Amino acid sequence: MLMEDGGLDTTSEEYRKLSKAERRKRRRATPKYRNLHATRERIRVESFNMAFSQLRALLPTLPVEKKLSKIEILRFSIAYISFLDNLLQ
């Protein structure tokens, strides 16, 4: 039985009677679902990258223009937080 979004109702009796290969074939996402998922993923990645940019802007590194990888940003952040913590103690 098809659902409103064009996908197959996996709880239906019709679906359970299909072989494993047929079920796998029918479970493929519809183009509409794939587009929605791609859009959500793109927004998630943009948000993630924006957070890294904001974190990068707070790090005192020289030169400021130097491009850092995400792992470098995280490692420098850890080191900087440790440094600031030591200053307070």
From Swiss-Prot:
GO biological process: determination of adult lifespan; positive regulation of DNA-templated transcription; regulation of transcription by RNA polymerase II
A cellular component annotation (GO) from this entry: nucleus
Phenotype of gene-disrupted mutants: RNAi-mediated knockdown extends mean lifespan and reduces expression of bcat-1 by >50%.
A GO MF label: DNA-binding transcription factor activity, RNA polymerase II-specific
PROSITE patterns assigned: BHLH
Residue ranges constituting the bHLH domain according to the UniProt record: 32-84
Tissue: Expressed in sensory head neurons of the lateral ganglion.
Subcellular location, principal: nucleus
Cellular compartments annotated: Nucleus
Region (Disordered): 1-32
Annotated region (Basic motif), positions in chain: 32-45
A Pfam family: HLH
CDD domains named in the record: bHLH_TS_HEN (cd11414)
Basic residues: compositionally biased ranges: 22-32
Highest rank taxon of the organism: Eukaryota
Start and end residues of each stretch annotated as Helix-loop-helix motif: 46-84
UniProt KW Zinc keyword: no
PANTHER family named in the record: HELIX-LOOP-HELIX PROTEIN 2 (PTHR13864:SF10), T-CELL ACUTE LYMPHOCYTIC LEUKEMIA/STEM CELL LEUKEMIA-RELATED (PTHR13864)
Function according to Swiss-Prot or TrEMBL: Transcription factor which binds the E box motif 5'-CA[TC][AG]TG-3'. Involved in modulating physiological aging, probably by regulating expression of branched-chain amino acid transferase-1, bcat-1.
Entry protein name: Helix-loop-helix protein 15
Organism: Caenorhabditis elegans
